[in-house]
Amino acid sequence: MHTDLESLNTYAHDETEDLHFLPAVVLIPKTVDEISKTMAYCHQHCIPVTPAGARTGLSGGSLPIYGGVLLSTEKLNQIIEIDEKNHQITTEPGVITQVLQETVKEKGLFYPPDPASRGSCFIGGNVSENSGGPKAVKYGVTQDYVLNLEVVMPDGAVIWTGANVIKNATGYNFPGLAVICSFVQIGGVVTEFV
């Protein structure tokens, strides 16, 4: 947890140089349970929560414009599983995109979205902003590679939004909808991706 002014200033901006919003506190959880408890508490007390990753974006999406809690995903940085047979990766949001790309390449797989900041941006930010890059012309953008999301909702409930299959006709495309609308906009925190 950070409450000192120097730390708060570090988290008060992204790569948009002219935007600066100071949070009241910065929390850096290590588990989904910590996020769930934080979200439930903040929801009960009407405290705004802004999820943030590496803050390399240019849209202001990770800025705490209402103050409150900035919830950093930097400690949620594990690649949980690489399923070579089904060509699927399960990862936490704080994994650096280039690290993910290099790790799957070692297994003979390919993760195409390649934003210019891939050496420092987190996969969570890529999903939240639906990042692309030069390879998007041929291979598509991030939403084209998201099958399922684990999301901590504002009340602390933990849900999964989809299924770990490419063909899934059991209802709405919630992972795609979540990427397009971004759970950040409705107050959820994405904690795992497939």
Language-model-detected regions and their locations in the chain:
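A short, small-residue-rich loop immediately preceding and capping a beta-strand
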Residues: V49-A54, F110
